[in-house]
């Protein structure tokens, strides 16, 4: 994997030099997942969930989320309430820290809630491309071993429920939390 970085202040006056810098950096392999160096803002040891709660405490009545196409506007306190409800629901159906929770959905409030709810409980949110067809969905879910899938019912002419049922007909007859689908062996909920 390679990384591209341009120090814009350093190379603002000399575009040609900046291009050479990018070419040079593109030839260097990425060898660190963490880059250590001085920063204006120090790193925090908080989790996303803990930091979110901290922000909510500081700004409970400030606007946090606007989803125009769903006509939704939530303050931080309202958004936190919804996030906590989803987090508790995920825990209640058996999602544990480290579990992979897939979301197969376009950008919407449910996607935002899932992002923060999974972070709060220590689950790993797996974003599934909303344009995926059944074979691509099967590959994605099986590759990362998703145990849970949250999905929209449909989007832009794609009926996600029908596609899931075609891939795993067992969905129609399973009990909640007890899915056993041959095509999706790790999916349980």
Q: Model-found features: residue ranges?
A:
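Flexible, non-catalytic linker and terminal segments flanking ANL/adenylate-forming cores
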Residues: 1-46
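Structural core segment of the AMP-binding/adenylate-forming
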Residues: 2-19, 121-189
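AMP-dependent adenylate-forming
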Residues: 26-32, 51-75
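Short, flexible loop segments at the rims of nucleotide/cofactor-binding pockets, characterized by
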Residues: 40-43, 78, 126-129
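Conserved AMP-binding/adenylate-forming core of the ANL superfamily
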Residues: 44, 61-116, 133-138
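Hydrophobic alpha-helical segments typical of transmembrane helices
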Residues: 47, 51-52, 136
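Aromatic/hydrophobic pocket-lining residues that form π-stacking "cages" and hydrophobic walls in ligand
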Residues: 52, 114, 164
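A generic structural signal for well-ordered alpha-helical segments
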Residues: 55-56, 118, 141
């Amino acid at each position: 994997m390679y990384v591209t970085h341009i120090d814009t202040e350093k190379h603002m006056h000399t575009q040609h030099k900046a291009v050479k810098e990018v070419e040079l950096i593109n030839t260097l392999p990425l060898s660190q997942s963490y880059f250590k160096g001085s920063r204006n803002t120090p790193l925090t040891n908080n989790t996303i969930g803990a930091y979110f709660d901290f922000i909510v405490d500081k700004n409970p009545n400030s606007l946090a989320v606007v989803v125009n196409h769903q006509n939704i506007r939530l303050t931080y306190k309202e958004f936190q309430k919804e996030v906590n409800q989803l987090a508790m629901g995920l825990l209640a159906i058996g999602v544990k820290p480290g579990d992979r929770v897939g979301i197969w959905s376009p950008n919407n409030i449910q996607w935002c809630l899932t992002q923060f709810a999974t972070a709060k409980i220590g689950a790993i949110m797996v974003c599934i491309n909303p344009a995926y067809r059944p074979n691509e969905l099967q590959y994605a879910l099986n590759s990362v071993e998703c145990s849970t899938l949250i999905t929209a019912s449909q989007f832009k002419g794609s009926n996600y429920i029908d596609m899931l049922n075609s891939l795993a007909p067992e969905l129609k007859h399973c009990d909640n939390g007890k899915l056993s689908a041959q095509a999706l062996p790790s999916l349980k909920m």
